[in-house]
Amino acid sequence: AQRLATLPTAYGGTGREWESTLNAAGALDGYREHIGDVNEADAIHYLAFDLQNPSSICNCIEFARTNARAVRTALTIEMWQSINTAWLEMKRFQAALGVRGPIDRLELSRFLDFIRKASLDFDGSAHRTMLRNDAHWFSRLGVYVERADTTARILDVKYNVLLPDSEAVGGSLDYFQWTA
């Protein structure tokens, strides 16, 4: 979302970029059901903060913490701390969002940087502190299955939805979309 929001607007800004982002996230149908027409502000809110979206970033952190509490004894201290810290920080972002309304680009950038760091923190703590037993390998398998699924969705959206018919493959818009 952070890079997509910074794409040059010389291409007409039809909103297809955000529609394709919702589609790649598997959230387009739910978005249309709850919100309707696709626009940047609503798409960002739906993907990041909307509690009606079960796959929003905030809901994912909430569910991760709930699940971690259920299996607390199977987690290392570092793993628990990383999940709990992410949950507490997310609550701070939600409280600030409730006071100010729609999130501005600077705060969105901070939020997405925080999410990236929290994800890397958990992944690093899991990789470095877990015993190499079935639980470790099962969690790694889950990571790779999710990666493969997301990669397949992105490739599908990129070549079937995003690039306008008038734009050449390998052109400037194609370049900006791939780097976003």
Where are these regions (language model features)?
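Alpha-helical transmembrane segments and their helix-helix packing motifs
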Residues: A1-A180
